[in-house]
């Protein structure tokens, strides 16, 4: 597993990315989510998803009150599928930020935000 921290100064938002996650990382994922305020069924579901170890899975949890997100991207069968999962999960982050800051999801700001998040992960993706 690789971990990465992205800080979006314009929004005061921190995104913790956990990439190439496998079943042995389930406890660490659970701890990160719990620290963010995730609990109950969503936490149990996330833990189970990681523990299953199936390829091409991901999840995103955001605490909009604290301006923090955790993005978990499991192992993928190929780089193209990994990119798909990364973009999918980062779009959830954009949705959460957009909800708080009233960013138009049909406008350029949301598109640039998504592009910036994905670009920030380039070195991890390049692996």
Model-based region annotation:
Residues 1-31, 56, 60-62, 99-100:
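N-terminal low-structure segments adjacent to metalloprotease catalytic domains
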Residues 29-33, 46, 121:
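Generic structural signal of hydrophobic/aromatic residues within well-ordered alpha-helices
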Residues 36-80, 93, 97:
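Active-site scaffold of zinc-dependent metalloenzymes
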Residues 76, 80, 102, 111:
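Acidic-and-aromatic substrate-binding clefts and catalytic sites of carbohydrate-active enzymes
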Residues 81-89:
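Short alpha-helical catalytic segment bearing the HExxH-like zincin motif
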Residues 82-83, 96-103, 123-125:
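Short, solvent-exposed secondary-structure capping/transition elements
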Residues 90-106, 110:
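Catalytic Zn2+-binding segment of zinc metalloproteases
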Residues 104-127:
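Post-HExxH zinc-binding segment in Zn-dependent metallohydrolases
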